[in-house]
């Protein structure tokens, strides 16, 4: 009987951990989507709501939360479908390039800085010549 209770406890603990894990993943996905939409807007992508039957058909065929590219009459365009809001972010090559610049800036801004270990830092700084302190 004690083994059965222990097994039941283990199952409940694993189930709770699974629920917490998947809830955390959903929260992370939402945060990433919100960040992407913000960067797309900053880059100049325009928010469009499908109006015609053809637009609704095209919108329905797009994958959600993924930046897709297409070419029409030699012009490249990019679309990000926000299914939750029922809109698409649409931009051309200049907006796409700006989006990538913003992503890089955001990534670099969030990169952690690490302090060099003392012996390595000292040997690194000595490579640039003697230190001169100006009054």
Feature-to-residue mapping (PLM):
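Bacterial N-terminal signal peptides that target proteins for export
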Residues: 2-13
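C-terminal motif of bacterial Sec signal peptides marking the signal peptidase cleavage site
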Residues: 20-24
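Bacterial signal peptide processing site
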Residues: 26-29
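Post-signal-peptide N-terminal segment of Sec-exported extracytoplasmic proteins
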Residues: 42-80
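Periplasmic N-terminal soluble interaction domains immediately after the signal peptide in Gram-negative
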Residues: 62, 66, 84-93, 103
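Solvent-exposed coil/turn segments that connect beta secondary-structure elements
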Residues: 72-75, 81-85, 93-96
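C-terminal partner/receptor-binding element of secreted or periplasmic proteins
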Residues: 94-135
């Amino acid at each position: 009987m004690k083994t059965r209770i222990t097994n039941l406890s283990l199952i409940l603990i694993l189930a709770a951990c699974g629920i917490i894990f998947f809830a955390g993943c959903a929260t992370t996905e939402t945060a990433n989507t919100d960040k992407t939409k913000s960067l797309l807007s900053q880059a100049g992508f325009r928010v469009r709501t499908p109006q015609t039957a053809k637009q609704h058909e095209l919108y329905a065929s797009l994958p959600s939360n993924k930046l897709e590219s297409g070419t029409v009459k030699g012009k490249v365009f990019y679309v990000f479908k926000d299914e939750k809001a029922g809109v698409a972010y649409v931009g051309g090559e200049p907006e796409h390039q700006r989006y990538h610049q913003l992503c890089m800036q955001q990534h670099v801004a969030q990169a952690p800085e690490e302090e060099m270990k003392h012996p390595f830092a000292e040997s690194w700084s000595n490579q640039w010549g003697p230190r001169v302190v100006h009054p």
